[in-house]
Amino acid sequence: ASRQIDSFIKWAKKQDWYTNTTIAVMGDHEMMAAPEIVGFANNEMTHYWLNFFINPVKTTERRKRFFSSLDFFPTILESIGAEIPQGALGLGRSLYSNQPTLLEKYGKDSIDNVLKKRSVEYDYFLYYKKGKK
């Protein structure tokens, strides 16, 4: 997969639209590599997800964040120049903002417990049959 990404990026760089295009690469599984390659010192991590943006409109100095896939929605939109009030959309927090993600604010266990709960509203939209009231 990494060779395919490399090939695509090299091809994209030759296209007229490249400088006006943001490429978002989102990992879908853990990878192993030397920690210093992705900015971790002293072997503090050996397995991690690799997510990165090429040519984002915005940049950030904050590198190490605790985030989930919920945070990709506002982050991707801000990476292409969208203005998001308070840096939040739905349950996601833009990683370009100074807003803490839900994982940073509440922790993984707390978020997992809340998301496992039953939602009457979700059940209504999932199971509601037209004509029944």
Question: What function would you assign to each model-found segment?
Answer:
Residues 20-21, 26, 46-49, 67:
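Active-site lining segments that contact anionic ligands and/or coordinate catalytic metals
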Residues 27, 53-55:
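Residue-level signal for short segments within beta-strands and strand-turn junctions
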Residues 2-5, 48, 69:
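Amphipathic alpha-helical segments in well-structured domains
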Residues 16, 57-133:
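Membrane-interface soluble catalytic domains
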Residues 2-39, 77:
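Metal-dependent active-site segment of extracytoplasmic phospho-/sulfohydrolases and closely related
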Residues 39-41, 63-64:
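Alpha-helix capping and helix-loop boundary segments enriched in small/acidic/polar residues
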Residues 18, 44-46, 90:
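A generic fold-level signal
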Residues 40-52:
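Flexible glycine/proline-rich, aromatic-decorated loop/lid segments
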